[in-house]
């Protein structure tokens, strides 16, 4: 079997662009994968198109060879964009391989370890603050005050979610706003230091959510790159009484992350922004986190399984970074089904309602668990007609 064509397709996803790669073969089998576009500040699409020139003619059933060969061409100028582009091609090859053998992707790696995976509600409330007009247009209740966070907590429990994760939301201006400094351009985002008042406001926000959740549903906070080591420690120590499922943060320095983990009783989750086994090695071998977050769309599912195996050797659980659409959900689900050391899976349940039509078989969730399908490949194809019905706006 040979790759004959590689295309990228995109559609309007509301506040984001939904992006897909389509890999065609000489035997008529088509492989799909979802990928992120824009996280690096520029588009990954031209990078995928550049790698496509080398990938055409390769055998997609040899997905590991395809991935390693393409990555080898980047050694003098490796980086996140290259990894993400190669990962998209690798993942589409995995879909082809599963379809060619008539099995789900997890079966290519000895799975499944489980037939369902617990999920948590990510960006709970915070994205409704960040994109208020869109969410109200889609029929979701707005978040205007702390009482609305309590209401959302109750809603999450009623839907069976095992945990929820939010981001800092402040109410000290005329309108509430989400603050996730460190990498998103906003006033003061380069300071990377919360004031005592801001930390106090974060505690109040989490207390409001906890009131709605009760004591048996996990509560997480994601502050991304918003602090330096000292700031992360101040925040983590202030949150200890809340008994968080985890505090999620990002840093490029393994020693700093180790200082944070060892300096607080709050469980620490991190590493979602890393690419490749070698970047993960010092963090995992140094036991810098309670939960290692791996992105199977940025790294590729096969490469991510290698990272997860390394984590397992150091008694560390894995959770996938997964703030994407329905095909991405299915890809992360297959990744989780192939792992023994997965803890929980990220899910954004309040997306633009039309995005479920972008796949032929949307994921099924029962009592807070996403069910692992037995269909070949990822378990669904992309609905190209639905993509055409929702073209990108203002491109």
Model-derived features: positions:
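Structured beta-strand/loop patches that form or line metal/cofactor-binding pockets in enzymes
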Residues: 1-32, 36, 351-356
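Conserved, mostly hydrophobic/aromatic
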Residues: 3, 28, 51, 89, ...
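Ligand-binding pocket scaffold of soluble enzyme catalytic domains
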Residues: 6, 21, 26-27, 32, ...
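Glycine-rich phosphate/pyrophosphate-binding beta-alpha loops
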Residues: 11-14, 34-42, 75, 122-129
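Metal- or metallocofactor-binding catalytic centers and their adjacent structured scaffolds
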Residues: 24-101
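Shared catalytic-loop signature of beta/alpha-barrel
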Residues: 46, 51, 65, 237-244, ...
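Metal-dependent enolase-superfamily TIM-barrel catalytic cores that perform enediolate-based chemistry
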Residues: 116, 121-258
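Extended hydrophobic packing segments that form well-structured cores
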Residues: 377-395
